[in-house]
Swiss-Prot record:
HAMAP family: PlsX. The gene is plsX. It comes from Trichormus variabilis (strain ATCC 29413 / PCC 7937) (Anabaena variabilis). This is Phosphate acyltransferase. The lineage of its organism: Bacteria, Bacillati, Cyanobacteriota, Cyanophyceae, Nostocales. Pfam families: FA_synthesis. Its EC number is 2.3.1.274.
Length: 342
């Protein structure tokens, strides 16, 4: 992108803390990251949420008449509410008035809107939500997909997730060539798992474009032995939310187990830098969002409970994706691999 200002469309009405926290994180990103944020939603609510002295050169309010609630059926809502904030924001990307989009609202609605407006990459049947997990090996994250876009999957969907994930891991996360791919399963043996796992295992094993090293059990997810792990969105979403919770549990236990009184205060002061680093490695707010991989546009999906720090980090991820030409890399590499397999 060079010196061009990256433009991020923000679904300001999506999420549990919208629009206040969404706007706060977006404005901070405009100030610290040099991006232009297009806040899509109710103009009055967004304007009321803007901090004093906001630089309006990098912040623009784009009106949207409606919003999609978390309890609505996503596809019907996206089709019925054409002027919903997620649709208006997605249209900005489609018309190339924005370079990327972020939403902390209904993830199903975000995916449906992306599919209807941006379309899929050639050869991709279903996009997947991919999120990066920290591992016990510092600086060696693992990409997990799908973590919620598709609760029911066919074996070929998981095979495509593995290909897309491998490209993203290699060209964006900078892992070694080729990335090591695992299939989330209940055992290491080839014969373990349900029908989906067994059939997917064979597809991954037979695909020359995937460096499949075998099944990954739950205990292997954070081991650092895998660069990419694929699963259906039902299992992946449970895994994601468990991982988000366990970080907070560990930190709470550490705080409770530190001695009380003067010795405890001294110990806490000594350990504070370590605890901060642990929190940064484990807190989902540090990562901000997950990419919707497989659609023809940079689309970041945030947690429904996202607050300003998460929004800021999601926008940072979106900017990095645009700067690193993630879509161009995914499209060109996937087309090469897809053509070779035909």
């Amino acid at each position: 992108m060079g010196s061009t200002c990256v433009r991020i469309a923000i679904d300001a009405m999506g999420g549990d803390h919208a629009p206040n926290e969404i706007v706060a994180g977006a404005v901070r990103a405009s100030e610290e990251l040099g991006v232009k944020v297009l806040l899509v939603g109710d103009p009055q609510q967004i304007a009321s949420a803007l901090p004093p002295k906001t630089n309006l050169e990098r912040v623009e309010i784009v009106p949207a008449e409606e919003a999609i609630a978390m309890d609505e059926e996503p596809l019907n809502a996206v089709r019925r509410k054409r002027k919903a904030s997620i649709n208006v924001a997605m249209d900005l990307v489609k018309r190339e008035q924005a370079d990327a989009i972020f939403s902390a609202g209904h993830s199903g609605a975000a995916m449906a809107s992306a599919l209807l407006r941006l379309g899929r990459l050639p050869g991709v049947d279903r996009p997947a939500i991919g999120t990066v997990f920290p591992t016990i090996k510092a600086g060696k994250p693992v990409l997990i997909l799908d973590v919620g876009a598709n609760v029911d999957c066919r074996p070929k969907f998981l095979e495509q997730f593995a290909v897309i994930g491998s490209i993203y891991s290699q060209y964006v996360l900078g892992t070694g060539e080729p990335p090591k791919v695992g299939l989330l399963n209940i055992g290491e043996e080839d014969t373990k798992g349900n029908e989906l796992a067994l059939r997917t295992h064979q597809l991954l094993k037979d695909n020359p474009n995937i460096n499949f090293i075998g099944n990954a059990e739950g205990r292997d997810v954070l081991s650092g032995e895998f660069d990419v792990i694929v699963c259906d969105g039902f299992v992946g979403n449970i895994l994601l939310k468990f991982a988000e919770a366990i970080g907070g549990v560990i930190l709470q236990i550490l705080r409770e187990e530190l001695p009380q009184g003067l010795h405890g205060q001294i110990g806490t002061a000594i350990l504070k830098p370590n605890l901060t680093r642990i929190k940064q490695r484990m807190d989902h707010a540090e990562h901000g969002g997950a990419l919707l991989l497989g659609v023809s546009g940079v689309c970041l999906i945030g947690h429904g409970s996202s607050q300003a720090p998460s929004v800021f980090n999601a926008i940072r991820m979106a900017k990095e994706a645009v700067d690193n030409q993630v879509m161009q890399q995914l499209q060109s590499q996937y087309e090469i691999l897809h053509s070779a397999s035909d």
